[in-house]
Amino acid sequence: MTTVGFDVAARLGTLLTAMVTPFSGDGSLDTATAARLANHLVDQGCDGLVVSGTTGESPTTTDGEKIELLRAVLEAVGDRARVIAGAGTYDTAHSIRLAKACAAEGAHGLLVVTPYYSKPPQRGLQAHFTAVADATELPMLLYDIPGRSAVPIEPDTIRALASHPNIVGVKDAKADLHSGAQIMADTGLAYYSGDDALNLPWLAMGATGFISVIAHLAAGQLRELLSAFGSGDIATARKINIAVAPLCNAMSRLGGVTLSKAGLRLQGIDVGDPRLPQVAATPEQIDALAADMRAASVLR
């Protein structure tokens, strides 16, 4: 970890759950369950939570719901964890408004995804991220996920954005460990693994931590993995990484939203079903997920 990475770890955390958004039976936002889930995840070892990200079904929630959710989670965890707000959309002006609203509510940082659907050029990406970073004083993470946004943030664009004082890191979900390692060395930006299957490799490359989906179900194990790696016990870190691999396999079948909501229900935490176009797991999928969770020792 670089000096900047250590600072970002203190400001934003090292084990962050990309938290689901709980919904009631009628599909409305369930802030009471969100508060309970947030406390549960912190109790299990998370020192950060991301709300209204991909796994939080951000495309299906209104700005008002995003702020209600942020407020509920901030009130629930207090000073026990950092709360990062997803503020990225495919519209720069909208992203700026949302970032300002999240900052006013007390978010500790922002996660801003690459604008999706419109496929902007790299020059447009640089201008977009710069404009959002200019809008508040909060530390901001770039969210690089071309599998969903169609366009990657190219290494030279990330290097250029690294000069902005509010842009402090990257959530990488494109599996480019080689470029990530070079960018960390060149810029001091903190990197977070955005792909649970690559958590340990990212640590080996110098990443600060994880923004994790499987932490919904295995936060304790991931905290142990981070602790083992940090103390130089690589054998234990590898053992834990292998142990949670069935959850990554399940996520590849179900997707992060369906996996997390079904898995939490199996663990006794009902966060409701996804909003369309995401869907709840079928009975057959739940049976297969339960087997994977037992294999990962997160379900009895």
From Swiss-Prot:
GO MF entries: 4-hydroxy-tetrahydrodipicolinate synthase activity
Biological process per Gene Ontology, one example term: diaminopimelate biosynthetic process
Locations listed in the record: Cytoplasm
SUPFAM superfamilies named in the record: Aldolase
Annotated InterPro entries: Aldolase_TIM, DapA, DapA-like, Schiff_base-form_aldolases_AS, Schiff_base-form_aldolases_CS
Active-site residues annotated for this sequence: Y143 (proton donor/acceptor), K171 (schiff-base intermediate with substrate)
Catalysed reaction equations from the record: L-aspartate 4-semialdehyde + pyruvate = (2S,4S)-4-hydroxy-2,3,4,5-tetrahydrodipicolinate + H2O + H(+)
Predominant location: cytoplasm
EC number annotated for this UniProt entry: 4.3.3.7
Pathway(s) it belongs to: Amino-acid biosynthesis; L-lysine biosynthesis via DAP pathway; (S)-tetrahydrodipicolinate from L-aspartate: step 3/4
Protein's UniProt keywords contain Transit peptide: no
Domain of life assignment: Bacteria
Keyword annotations of the record: Amino-acid biosynthesis, Cytoplasm, Diaminopimelate biosynthesis, Lyase, Lysine biosynthesis, Schiff base
Pfam families, per the entry: DHDPS
Residues involved in pyruvate binding: T55, I211
Record bears the keyword Glycosyltransferase: no
Site (Part of a proton relay during catalysis): T54, Y117
Activity regulation note: Is insensitive to feedback inhibition by (S)-lysine.
Family of the protein in this entry: Belongs to the DapA family.
Subunit relationships: Homotetramer.
Entry function: Catalyzes the condensation of (S)-aspartate-beta-semialdehyde [(S)-ASA] and pyruvate to 4-hydroxy-tetrahydrodipicolinate (HTPA).
Misc. remarks from the entry: Was identified as a high-confidence drug target.
Annotated protein name in UniProt: 4-hydroxy-tetrahydrodipicolinate synthase
Record organism: Mycobacterium tuberculosis (strain ATCC 25618 / H37Rv)
